[in-house]
Structure formats: structure tokens, C-alpha cells
């Protein structure tokens, strides 16, 4: 399973359960099944996401469809046109579908007392994640022309709901809490989702591919509309915008273009950091108001925070905003 993620959603759920003071065997058994369903759904999303993006690697290993298709050649599509379909792509599509079925089976294992509420939320999460993936594809097709509202909505749907809101609410339901926590958690999760999506954008551009497992050239070459690009472009002088327009969306961008873009990100980091602090601050305030302790919030953020080793030193200076 670690090929498909760090299990951070399950770890977030565990911290929330601990913070709610619930840890009986029935609650933990229910949470285990709920988290299994969530992790299987996450694996399905990654397999399909790599297929959609035509990604060759994930975490420095071949993506599922690339690994499966290696050395198998191609097979003919079952139609009159004689098109060729890569066997790996077929396997990736079907494997993702199979993982979705397995995730539903895991949810079915939740005891009846908690199953209805969790299953209802799980369906909502799945639909939002799928819609968020579509929004992400549209943003990439539109290149850098999209506005910040569209970018934020994509981050909430694609990232926040199943990475933050789902594990927190699963724990709340398993602990016997009702829908009274849904509002605060959705608000906090939406802010966290935007914040960590922005951090992911920074990491992809500024990071060492050997550490991040991602190419820093992908977004640069595609001209993808990201929150990071929007913020940097908003802060650029006329001369800097000329540089930005030359390198962002350049299909054959290389190290020279990447260096220019990285320099612009570094120069305008204070504006990016201000947005991060606003988003994280709003999330923390909402969780505190719902009764979550500072320690629980700190633990949640530590699990959600993406790897920053090998990233520009500025990232280590992000103010965590905690007292003491």
C-alpha cells in the first residue's frame, strides 16, 4: 500500500480519534474498516490519475500502467478501426475500478451503528474527488488563464474532502459524535486542502525529483493553472511578467527555464507564505472553536504536511503559528 501513499489519512483519523477521547474496541474496529475503504479509494484515484496524466513514475517507481505494460507490447482494441490500446492502460483502468469495488466492500464491513453515516459521507467524498480530478484536467487544458476561485474549488474537491475532511469525520462518527462537527471540519478541511495543495505546487517546482518523486518541469511545460503560479504572476513587475510568460507553458522548457521560474518563486515567496498562513490560521481557528486541542491540531498538520526535505530553505521557515 505504501506504493500508493503514506497512509497519512489513516494517521490523521487516529489523531482525531485520540483527540476525541475515544478508543474502545468497537470504535477502533469501525474506524479500521472506514480507513481501509479510504486508502483503497486513494489507491484507485492514484492509478487513474497517473493514467489520465500519462505519468511514467510515481515516487521514483514506474506507475501501475507503465509497470504492467512493460514488455507486453500492445493489443488491438475490439472495434473496426483497428486502434491500438496499450495493455498497461487497459490494466490501469481495470485495476482502478477493482480498487473502487474493494473500497466499497471495506465500507460494508463497518458495524451497522456507524455504517449509514460513514457510507453517506463516503459517497459524497468519491463524487467530489472525481469532479475535482475533472476540474484539475480543465485547469491544465486552460493553462494559466484560470482565476483563483476555480483553482481553490479544485483544491477543495480534489484534495480537501478525501485527505482531510473524510478521515476526521470518519473518526467523529466512529466515536459516536453526530453531524455537529461536520460544519467546522468541512470549513477547516477546505482551508487545509487549499494550503497543502499550494505547498504541493511549491514542492513540485522547487524540489529535488530524487526526493519528491515528481519532475519539477511538468507544471512548467504544461502551463498548468496553479495557485502558486497565480500568486507569483500577481506579484511580478512588468519585466518579470515578460520572463514568466516566456518560460511558463514552454513545451520544451529545460533547466534554464526552470531556474528562471524558481528565482521568481523565491523572490515572491513572502506573498505565497502570507496566503499559506491565512489558510492554516483559518483552519486552526475553526478546529479550536469545535473543541480540538492544540496538540491534536499539531498532530493533524504534521501528518498532512508533505515532505519538504531537499526543498528550497524558505519552506522550512513557514510559521506553524503555535504558541509556546
Where are these regions (language model features)?
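All-alpha prenyltransferase/terpene-synthase fold signal
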Residues: 1-324
Amino acid at each position: 500500500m505504501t506504493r500508493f501513499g503514506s497512509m497519512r489519512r489513516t494517521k490523521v483519523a487516529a489523531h482525531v480519534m485520540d483527540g476525541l477521547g475515544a478508543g474502545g474496541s468497537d470504535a477502533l474496529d469501525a474506524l479500521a474498516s472506514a480507513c481501509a475503504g479510504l486508502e483503497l479509494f486513494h489507491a484507485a484515484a492514484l492509478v487513474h490519475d497517473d493514467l489520465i496524466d500519462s505519468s511514467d513514475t510515481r515516487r521514483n517507481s514506474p506507475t501501475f500502467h507503465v509497470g504492467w505494460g512493460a514488455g507486453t507490447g500492445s493489443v488491438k482494441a475490439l472495434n473496426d478501426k483497428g486502434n491500438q490500446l496499450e495493455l498497461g492502460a487497459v490494466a490501469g483502468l481495470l485495476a482502478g475500478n477493482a480498487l473502487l469495488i474493494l473500497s466499497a466492500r471495506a465500507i460494508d464491513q463497518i458495524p451497522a451503528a456507524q455504517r449509514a453515516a460513514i457510507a453517506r459521507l463516503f459517497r459524497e467524498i468519491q463524487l467530489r474527488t472525481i469532479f475535482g480530478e475533472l476540474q484539475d484536467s480543465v485547469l491544465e487544458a486552460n493553462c494559466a488563464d484560470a482565476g483563483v476561485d476555480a483553482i481553490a474549488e479544485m483544491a477543495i474537491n480534489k484534495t480537501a474532502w478525501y485527505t482531510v475532511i473524510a478521515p476526521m469525520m470518519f473518526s467523529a462518527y466512529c466515536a459516536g459524535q453526530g453531524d455537529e462537527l461536520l460544519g467546522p471540519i468541512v470549513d477547516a478541511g477546505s482551508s487545509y486542502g487549499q494550503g497543502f495543495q499550494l505547498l504541493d505546487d511549491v514542492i513540485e517546482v522547487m524540489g529535488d525529483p530524487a526526493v519528491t518523486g515528481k519532475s519539477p518541469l511538468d507544471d512548467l511545460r504544461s502551463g498548468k493553472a496553479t495557485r502558486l503560479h497565480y500568486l507569483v504572476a500577481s506579484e511580478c513587475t512588468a519585466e518579470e511578467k515578460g520572463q514568466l510568460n516566456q518560460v511558463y507553458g514552454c513545451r520544451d522548457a529545460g533547466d534554464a527555464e526552470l531556474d528562471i521560474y524558481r528565482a521568481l518563486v523565491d523572490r515572491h515567496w513572502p506573498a505565497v507564505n502570507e496566503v499559506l498562513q491565512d489558510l492554516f490560521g483559518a483552519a486552526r481557528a475553526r478546529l479550536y472553536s469545535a473543541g480540538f486541542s492544540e496538540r491534536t491540531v499539531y498532530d493533524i498538520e504534521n501528518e498532512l504536511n508533505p515532505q519538504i526535505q531537499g526543498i528550497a530553505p524558505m519552506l522550512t521557515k513557514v510559521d506553524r503559528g503555535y504558541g509556546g
